[in-house]
Amino acid sequence: SGVAQVAAHPGYVPGYALSAEMIRHDTALLKLAAPIPSAVAAPFVLAVEGRAGQEVSVVSYGRGREAALSWQRACGVTAAGQGLLALDCDVTFGSSGAPVFTGEHGRARIVSVISSGNTSGGPPIAYGMALPDLVEDLKAQLRREAGPATATARRVKVGQGGGASGAKFAKP
């Protein structure tokens, strides 16, 4: 029922000119107020950092295709390094934030998120960021800003449970 917490990388400043530094940090992590049941949406695992020559796919809503999800099944990482990925994926305005997937171990994994792209004349090019270290930093930021966990009382009776508390109770 909404977003409980947001962590945005301090290296990203909205409204500034596009640069490698901006693309590298163009990610935020949202902590939801309530978990999404796995029966509704299965979570995706992050892929190991992207590499040049890697085949990827992009799922997005972009300008002119807002009503239907677009899936480019085959495009690739053309360059990777210094926390950045260049892709030959066909993205358009509005595709920012779209996940870039790769298939690893028989499962789709997120390798990047679209930050920007250029389709003006010439072949398509899109840019994303390397996620593993960035996501770890954002998770740490969420933990720091969450504050200490609040203790809650729980009634435990002899002979009941034990598995949830770690303690085992036996009737005398």
Show the residue positions of the predicted features:
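Short, mixed charged/polar active-site loops
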Residues: 1, 68-72, 108
